């Protein structure tokens, strides 16, 4: 057995004496001493003629030993069963020192390297005498007077022990080579990335479930005296983690979004302005002299309009609705926003500027007269039907002269004639859709008079009916279905010769009866016993 194993065996025998407590015996001065030399026999004066047998001498020595009463003294520093913990910690310290000086650990490797000679025996550590190790262990046990052994005390002793001892590894496997055995960590271990601060590392070491120091927090196991604890990280890894400052890593810390520098924003604005000036110059060259507006004046009005709109409390959507009620054309919120940001074409901005300027002037005068924003939004200013009736606050509620008001009214009426009115989307009910489907089945291309009769019978506009027939024919072309009467559309249907002489109501009734007959015909075909049997559709009188 080597020196290190003899040392551990000695400690085990000492601690086994009284259930894990350190026990010493007070013996005679002849048996006590600093060294472990054997007791000397009692000196006696023996003559040459007197012969004392050897058995007698042995008996006298045994009697002396019995006469000395033994007294057990328990170490006050060992009040708990910590034998396994100390032995496992010492074994772990020695093994970690050997592995640290023998093998260069790979960077980022979380597995522990254990060296073995293949015979289950620990490797001998040269340069560490048995007496030196015993003396250091005794000093460690006697230096802790508070009655407890914790991990902090063991770490301090281990640091002092490591500074003074520089072991030199010696192989005992007979080949002169050390065989590294890589063993993966227990699944109870967590990743070393979680121990980025000394506080977290110490907390993890003191946690029994992680298994850094064993089941009882000191690296020992209750299964046996010299049972090996769980595999723990190497001292180099723990020391590097302890010395690592607490700093958030770059990968885990999200970078703060950098604001756009003012130089870039100014460059974008300048390029946007140059693009607007170029397009405006090209469009202004093609415009007449009356409609041409200076670009600087247009930009100044856009800024003024935005400030006044915000001052009065109007949103961009409110301005679009108010312009739609005033001039009969709906303006979306996007249009007003693009006008304020100079994102519209120069020609469209020139057309929209007079409308916004007049609306802004009317709103300013109405608010000065005591009107509220809600009243101005809810006020109806559009025309009813084909009768153009324009209501102006500045004409009826202010003291402007009659000449100015007449000029304003006439200019608005003339401008309304040039504004394109957008037709509202027509929603057809179920009866109107069914009637149009029936008419389309009879004649997909009705002439002008037929289309007018259909529109009057369904109480729809003729343009709505015309667009519906056009869309339906386009839909039928997309699905590649044949359309009856595509080439020639006579004024009188050959199937129903008397159809043209009917009124609109009679035509709808006849079309509905035809549809019901077709449905009954389909039902009779589906329930007939023979597919070749003639079916009675009930429409033979036609």
From Swiss-Prot:
Residues 243-252, 517-530 have a biased composition (Polar residues). SUPFAM superfamilies: Homeodomain-like, lambda repressor-like DNA-binding domains. Belongs to the POU transcription factor family. This is Homeobox protein ceh-18. PROSITE patterns: HOMEOBOX_1, HOMEOBOX_2, POU_1, POU_2, POU_3. Keywords: Developmental protein, DNA-binding, Homeobox, Nucleus. Residues 421-480 bind DNA. Disruption phenotype: Viable, but some animals exhibit sterile and lethal phenotypes including hermaphrodite sterility, embryonic lethality and larval arrest. Defective ovulation and terminal differentiation of oocytes, which result from a delay or an inability to complete meiosis during oogenesis. Defects in gonadal migration. Defective sheath cell differentiation in terms of cell shape and position and defective functions which include weaker sheath cell contractions. Abnormal hypodermal cell differentiation. Defective MAPK activation in oocytes in the presence and absence of sperm.
């Amino acid at each position: 057995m080597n020196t290190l194993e003899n040392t551990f065996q000695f400690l085990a025998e000492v601690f086994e004496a009284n259930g894990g407590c350190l026990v010493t015996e007070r013996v005679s001065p002849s048996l006590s001493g600093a060294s472990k030399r054997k007791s000397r026999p009692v000196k006696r004066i023996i003559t040459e003629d007197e012969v004392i047998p050897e058995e007698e001498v042995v008996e006298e020595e045994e009697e002396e030993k019995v006469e000395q009463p033994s007294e057990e003294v328990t170490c006050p520093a060992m009040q708990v069963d910590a034998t396994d913990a100390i032995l496992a910690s010492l074994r772990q310290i020695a093994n970690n020192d050997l592995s640290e000086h023998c093998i260069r650990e790979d960077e980022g490797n979380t597995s522990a390297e254990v060296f073995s000679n293949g015979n289950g025996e620990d490797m001998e550590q040269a340069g560490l005498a048995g007496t030196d190790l015993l003396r250091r262990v005794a000093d460690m046990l006697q230096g802790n007077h508070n009655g407890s052994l914790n991990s902090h005390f063991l770490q301090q002793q281990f640091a002092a022990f490591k500074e003074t001892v520089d072991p030199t590894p010696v192989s005992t496997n007979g080949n002169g080579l050390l065989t590294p055995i890589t063993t993966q960590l227990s699944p109870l271990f967590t990743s070393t990335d979680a121990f980025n601060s000394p506080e977290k590392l110490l907390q993890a070491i003191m946690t029994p479930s992680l298994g850094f120091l064993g089941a009882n927090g000191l690296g020992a196991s209750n299964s046996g005296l010299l049972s090996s604890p769980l595999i723990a990280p190497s001292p180099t890894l723990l020391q590097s983690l302890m010395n690592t400052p607490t700093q958030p890593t770059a990968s885990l810390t999200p970078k703060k979004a950098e604001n756009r520098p003012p130089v870039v924003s100014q460059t974008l604005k300048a390029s946007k302005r140059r693009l607007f000036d170029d397009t405006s110059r090209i469009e202004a060259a093609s415009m007449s002299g009356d409609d041409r507006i200076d670009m600087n004046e247009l930009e100044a009005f856009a800024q003024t309009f935005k400030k006044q709109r915000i001052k009065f409390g109007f949103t961009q959507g409110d301005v679009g609705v108010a312009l739609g009620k005033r001039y009969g054309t709906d303006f979306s919120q996007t249009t007003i926003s693009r006008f304020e940001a100079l994102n519209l074409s120069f020609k469209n901005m020139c057309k929209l500027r007079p409308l916004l300027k007049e609306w802004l002037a009317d709103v300013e005068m109405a608010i000065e007269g005591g009107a509220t924003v809600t009243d101005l939004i809810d006020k109806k200013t559009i025309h009813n039907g084909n009768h153009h009736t324009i209501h102006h606050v500045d004409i009826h509620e202010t003291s402007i002269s009659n000449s100015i008001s007449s000029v304003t009214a006439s200019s608005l009426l003339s401008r309304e004639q040039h504004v394109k009115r957008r037709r509202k989307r027509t929603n057809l009910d179920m009866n109107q859709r069914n009637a149009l489907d029936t008419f389309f089945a009879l004649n997909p291309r009705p002439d002008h008079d037929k289309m007018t009769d259909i529109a009057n019978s369904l109480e729809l506009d003729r343009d709505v009916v015309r667009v519906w027939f056009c869309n339906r024919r386009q839909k039928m072309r997309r699905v590649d279905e044949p359309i009856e009467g595509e080439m020639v559309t006579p004024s009188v249907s050959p199937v129903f010769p008397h159809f043209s002489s009917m009124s609109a109501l009679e035509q709808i009734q006849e079309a509905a009866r035809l549809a019901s007959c077709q449905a009954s015909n389909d039902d009779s075909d589906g329930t007939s016993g023979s597919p070749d049997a003639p079916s009675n559709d009930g429409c033979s009188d036609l």
